[in-house]
Amino acid sequence: INGAIDAVSHIQPYALQCLQERSGSSVLTDGLDLYGKGYSDCVLAARTPLLEEKPEAVKAVIKAMMTAQLMTEQDTLSTLEETVGKYYKTSLESLKLAQSSQPVMIDQRNNTKFFYDRSVSMQKMGYVKNTLPSKAVNWTLLEEVIAENADLYGKLELKTAA
């Protein structure tokens, strides 16, 4: 980071990496003051035909994400070591800090209103023409995965809809 920019908005862990690597930089917001604890900045999106034709494949991805969350909660350091350099192009130290500020939480059902509210904000800022359609957020497959894997779900520490 050579100082050629005045401001940056970025996801974790890269936001923290910018902060660490540029002397004199400061955080204006980390999202918590805007959105509150437990907000999501990432979602799993799938086209309707995929959901209709291959729901088991989507459910397998959801279960894998829940399994990864559990692995992260049970042994954070090992999980981060597995992903640093391969998935996240940053230092282990930056990744640890990012994980502590925005931990993995797959069950985002209590954030439904948050998603719709953000689409209204995006429309007001001119980024999108239409707000999120009411049927765009569908928790059916997540709820099926939870029901089919109650033991796994029960072990998760972070859940927005317990």
Predicted regions and their residues:
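Generic low-complexity, intrinsically disordered sequence content enriched
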Residues: 20, 81-84, 99, 145-146, ...
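Conserved C-terminal helix/tail region of periplasmic/extracytoplasmic solute-binding proteins
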Residues: 123-162
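Short loop/turn and capping residues at structural boundaries
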Residues: 11, 29, 96, 133-134
